[in-house]
């Protein structure tokens, strides 16, 4: 994570703890094309609602890195702006409570509704501050309960008690940036941006494919874990070694698309791992065949 990103996170955290995250929304980066300005403006409003102005400022700081950068056209910048906003507003129990309350506010006088979502214990604990969550996770890991046990949570606006509980759950956003889940998401976003940056330097034609790998990670639960695992497998098995110069892969974009097509909802990732190994072997054999003989 860059020094600027760390400072932005710390500045937001300290302001939030003392109740002073009432800053004005951050300004859009200079030099944004008009269509991207619209996307970024919507993202800022989304992230202010999600977490606060300080958090939206982190988004702006991250987006600014790619404004005017060589090789980044309007379409690519728009995709970065859109997909980064989606990932920075990741779905957790706090967000579900926020959206449920927003649904109630948007439909005054309408009958309430209830949604039931199932979470694993590690997901629920992951929304807590890390200093608390780590002790609980260690105990539950020892018991083998963290992923095996599912908990059904009811998000309801049908009663005053349900609404009150939603407000309490939504109010936990104050601690979100100290949570285990946020730490993982922050690392992921920074690594995704880093891989985009490396692609622009090492293999510019693959940059759009790297940008769009963000769509692999969605939601929560098993779908989220599978997407994250598949993303890491593709980046670690294909993109990073190509950028490092240890894998002679001339068409990284095609390889990423091929690997994504092979990804199945399989925790063992058998098909994906076979495909990545096949692509690596093919690239190595091709480079060997075209190498000049001594």
Each language-model region and where it sits:
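Active-site loops and adjacent core secondary-structure elements that bind or stabilize anionic groups
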Residues: 1-294
